[in-house]
């Protein structure tokens, strides 16, 4: 099965089973960013079924490129293993199962790209745990940061979304205003932020 076959199967599975994966409108930007930064060591929070990991894998350094990806949900973790093991990139992707807020406290590696795509209300807390492991000049991508148009603009979020929206606003305030980040927000899909980490001493 080719990589395109696997990705197509994942898109169908995600649609049928209501699994959130990158939207078609975001995929081109996502691939462009990975291709631009050419990371060798990637940390992903929110594997889902491994779709974004398989988009990234061919764009990494052929010799040293590696992805570590964390997922809490048992079924999604198993589906990610199923799809990734069918690909040519199984040796480049390490899947960890567990609550990211706990797993992140046990990190020992260093990463030059981080992709936040797990629980939206946890982005800032997770970023604070991850930053000691981000190389200077590393990049943090965060998906869904505009969350249905509620985070920026005049739309009032329904009560059930108020906490998520508030926490995403706090995340964006942090990465846009701290001097050690250079942040750009792209409006494609549900919004993606790209923050370049200038280092701990900047």
Where are each of the predicted segments found?
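A short alpha-helical cap/connector motif
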Residues: 1-113, 120-141, 145-202
């Amino acid at each position: 099965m080719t990589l395109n076959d696997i990705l197509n199967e994942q898109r169908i599975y995600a649609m049928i089973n209501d699994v959130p994966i990158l939207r078609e409108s975001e995929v081109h930007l996502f691939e462009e960013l990975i291709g631009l930064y050419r990371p060798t060591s990637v940390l992903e929070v929110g594997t889902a079924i491994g779709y974004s990991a398989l988009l990234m894998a061919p764009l990494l350094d052929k010799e040293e490129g590696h992805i570590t990806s964390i997922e809490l949900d048992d079924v999604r973790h198993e589906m990610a293993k199923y799809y990734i093991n069918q690909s040519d990139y199984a040796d480049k992707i390490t899947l960890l199962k567990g609550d990211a807020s706990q797993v992140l406290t046990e990190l020992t590696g260093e990463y030059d790209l981080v992709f936040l795509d797990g629980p939206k209300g946890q982005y800032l807390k997770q970023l604070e745990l991850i930053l000691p492991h981000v190389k200077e000049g590393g990049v943090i991508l965060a998906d869904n940061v505009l969350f249905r148009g509620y985070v920026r603009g005049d739309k009032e979020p329904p009560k059930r979304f108020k906490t998520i929206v508030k926490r995403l606003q706090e995340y964006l305030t942090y990465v846009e205003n701290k001097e050690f980040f250079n942040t750009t927000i792209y409006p494609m899909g549900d919004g993606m932020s790209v923050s370049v980490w200038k280092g701990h001493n900047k």
